[in-house]
């Protein structure tokens, strides 16, 4: 209770409060904070690093993925990310030999996920350790679809995964199992398709639809528009205006 009081005291004494989602602004407003002092500056993409480039065919061949349609997840393998659902879904899609799932990263659930992959006998999944930040773009380049997934929970309707912006910056259509504000962004820009978290039938349907050439092309264009509107240079300029207005 004391720390909550201190938190509210800081909010009320601040000239400006910067939050990274509209949901956070609504939460603070519901707690009695003046909405006029709350500014939303969302995360974005470093377009100097994450920009469209040709697929790294050498890397793709090195990983044994030549000729495959690669569905990729690059990021933390934690409890929130529900990657066991992805492995189980991949197993059910083994009858499509062209599809291959690439999971890159580490985290609290990595070992149990590796064990689950072996138990399921997945032949269409490759799991790699984390790569250096400066090499991430190289791995994103070999993806045909960026996979973003979170556990089905009201808690995650307020978050916006940063993977959205990096993959959109590189023009990789997004298949996302996250509800709420993140889903709204994907839908607004047409940068991909969203499935109900932890629903395999919807996952399969949306993946199939996303890979249709016409839909895929539209989503690539949607990625471009999304990245243009979430360019970090623009967001930094907005942030600077907020700081200057608070002087």
Regions found by a protein language model. Name each.
Residues 1-17:
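Membrane-proximal helix-turn-helix segments that form the acceptor-binding/catalytic region
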Residues 23, 44:
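Carbohydrate-associated surface elements
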Residues 202, 215-229:
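A short, well-ordered alpha-helix in the C-terminal region of glycosyltransferases
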Residues 98-105, 110-138:
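Nucleotide-activated donor-binding/catalytic signature segment of Leloir-type glycosyltransferases, i.e.
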Residues 81, 132-139, 144-168, 175-184:
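Nucleotide-sugar-dependent
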Residues 65-90, 102, 220:
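Conserved donor-binding/catalytic core segment of Leloir-type glycosyltransferases
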Residues 1, 51-64, 220:
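A short helix/loop element that forms part of the nucleotide-sugar donor recognition site in Leloir-type
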């Amino acid at each position: 209770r004391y720390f909550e009081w201190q938190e509210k005291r800081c909010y009320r004494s601040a000239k400006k409060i910067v939050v990274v989602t509209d949901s956070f602004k609504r939460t603070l407003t519901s707690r009695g904070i003046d909405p006029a002092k709350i500014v939303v500056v969302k995360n974005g993409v470093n377009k100097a690093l994450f920009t469209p480039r040709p697929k790294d065919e050498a890397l793709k061949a090195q990983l044994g993925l030549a000729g495959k349609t690669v569905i990729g997840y690059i990021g933390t393998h934690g409890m929130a990310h529900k990657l066991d659902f992805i492995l189980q879904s991949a197993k059910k899609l083994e009858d499509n030999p062209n599809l291959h799932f690439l999971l890159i990263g580490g985290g609290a659930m990595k070992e149990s996920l590796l064990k689950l992959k072996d138990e399921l006998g997945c032949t269409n999944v490759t799991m790699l350790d984390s790569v250096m930040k400066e090499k991430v773009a190289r791995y994103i380049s070999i993806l045909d679809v960026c996979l973003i997934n979170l556990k089905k929970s009201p808690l995650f309707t307020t978050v916006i995964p940063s993977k959205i912006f990096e993959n959109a910056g590189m023009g990789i259509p997004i298949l996302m199992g996250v509800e709420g504000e993140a889903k709204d962004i994907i839908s607004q820009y047409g940068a991909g398709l969203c499935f109900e978290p932890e629903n395999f039938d919807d996952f399969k349907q949306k993946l199939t639809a996303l890979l249709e050439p016409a839909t895929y092309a539209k989503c690539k264009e949607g990625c471009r528009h999304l990245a243009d509107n979430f360019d970090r240079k623009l967001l930094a300029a907005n942030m600077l205006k907020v700081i200057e207005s608070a002087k």
